[in-house]
Amino acid sequence: MTEPPMRIALLIALLLSSLSAYSEPLAPFAAEFRIYVNKLPTPVKADLVLEPAGKPDYYHMLLKAKSFLLTNKEESYFYWNDCQPRTDRYVHEFDGFGQHRYHHMQFQWDPPRVHNESEDDAASMDIADDTLDELTILLRGRCVFATGDKEYTVTSAYGDDLRTHHFVVIDREKIDTPLGKVDTLVVENRRTGDSKKKRRTLFWVAPDLDYMVVKAKHIESTFLKAEMIMIDYHGPTLEERAAAAEDQAKKTRPGAE
């Protein structure tokens, strides 16, 4: 029988291999989603893309929803180090219904500060050193959930506002995706100070896909619910990701060369 000290050593090794896998470079992907409102399909589709951006540990993440009536685009350029995204710049643009609204945000970190330009204003504000943007806040969950923790809190900067988000795992669910049936964690984004008690935002994140969002749901009220469901995916398959994780685990096992 394995002695307790050896058990502890093995558990530490397994934990370190798990953390190491999620501090590795991010795997690029492109996914397409269909938007449903009150369970009815709409003509709106959304693209979610993660790709390297030309410098070491530097990435571009894009979420773009488009139909013949509107275009809504969010994108973030950020560095990824030690399981932590650090935003360089963030853009949110909306075109539709005769309106054009936008936020162009430039982050600096010495000292931590963000400058925002919008359609009618420009302002700067100090931020905490761990502040994220609205698009990359879920990436932080990769490493938190990989350790077995069920919740985390982050602050995001948006426009001239700072927002606190509390993400909590509330369930597990197997769902159908373009890659087949996958196991997911159901994560709720609990906003601090939200005046609408019935408003909820849920994300289904897949551990076997590096905690990628494969489904999202926003409940505005009893009568208005919207869902974003993945309908296409291009990137590492479940088998390729499992093989890469196993290879990484072998490298971090005690006695590995």
Feature locations, PLM:
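Short hydrophobic "helix-edge" motifs at membrane interfaces and signal-peptide entry regions
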Residues: 9-10, 169
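Intrinsically disordered, low-complexity regulatory regions of eukaryotic regulatory proteins
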Residues: 1, 22-23
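Hydrophobic, well-structured mid-protein blocks that either form specific transmembrane helices
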Residues: 100-145
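N-terminal signal peptide c-region/cleavage motif recognized by signal peptidases
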Residues: 18-20
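Acidic, serine/threonine-rich low-complexity disordered tracts
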Residues: 24-109, 146-257
